[in-house]
């Protein structure tokens, strides 16, 4: 994961949408860690592990008005690669929610939206969904507060490991967050 170029206006828009999503599901103050599956469930999604190939992290399917996706009684489904670590699974769920919040309206075809995430594919939408996930799981103010509370003598790697454990996200996501927020 490396940081990507995005306009400040786009970043602000995504940050606001992530904060609005947390507020919509009832979070007044963001807990650490965010219960991302509860967030997804509150937005109407069923979430589960899926048998996917190694290069596929997850997928999202939305079929408005239908209540059957792959035999599951739902019109919104997020599937995550069952082989990923718990921290990565959390990030994948948040990433797929990012696709829904940010891209559903522009990409839905007659109420149907399906998207599969390949590890090798990184484009503007993927980067935006990653940024949404980071803001949902590690909101700027909360992340900065926790980062600033760490002892100064700790190195970048140690800080990343501690914050990854606290936010229950992959260490790579924390390192990318360092870059996004220009901390250190």
Where do the PLM segments sit?
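Active-site hotspot residues in diverse enzymes, especially metal/ion-binding acidic/histidine motifs
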Residues: 1-184
